[in-house]
A protein has these predicted regions:
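ATP/NTP phosphate-donor binding region
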Residues: 1-37, 41, 49-53, 76-91, ...
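Short phosphate-engaging motifs
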Residues: 15, 46, 137
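Short glycine-rich anion-binding loops that position phosphate/pyrophosphate groups of nucleotides
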Residues: 43-46, 67-69
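Catalytic core of DAGKc-family lipid kinases
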Residues: 71-141
Length: 141
């Protein structure tokens, strides 16, 4: 399938916003529900945020660096964006699912792309069990 319908998202960075406007004028912009791909303009943090907030859409995300380093992003250049998206190599990322149970038995779950962190509001020691794919790796931390 050739991707044609793009949905553009940009970080608050002025350069990212400027390029979003340029791309939307050149390629048009689809509502996310009608898009075939998401174009994320920003840095690595924006890419991670875009991936997490758009998991339910199950769309490929093509990142273009308008941040500082951009390890997760493609370089910004003047080549045809549709051609670049269609020529890109796809990778699948499996998000992490974090489940936490409070002392009173209430369960909380969250999905994460890059990392999971826990914050406590008390000074008591935390009892943490780590399981990966249903197998206990650390019984108590």
């Amino acid at each position: 399938m050739t991707i044609q319908k793009l949905h553009f998202l940009a970080s608050e960075n002025n350069d990212a916003q400027k390029h979003k406007d340029i791309f939307e004028k050149k390629y048009g912009s689809c509502a996310i529900d009608g898009a075939e791909a998401i174009i994320a303009l920003g840095g690595d943090g924006f890419m991670l945020e875009t991936m997490k907030s758009n998991m339910d859409h199950k769309l490929p995300i093509f990142g273009i660096n308008h941040g500082s380093v951009g390890f997760l992003m493609n370089a910004s250049n003047d080549l045809d964006l549709i051609d670049r998206v269609n020529a890109s190599q796809s990778i699948t990322i499996s998000p992490l699912k974090m489940s936490a149970v409070t002392p009173d038995g209430k369960e909380h779950t969250a999905m994460a792309i890059n990392e999971v962190s826990l914050l406590r509001e008390m000074h008591q020691a935390a009892k943490i069990k780590i399981s990966i794919d249903g197998k206990v790796r650390i019984d108590e931390l």
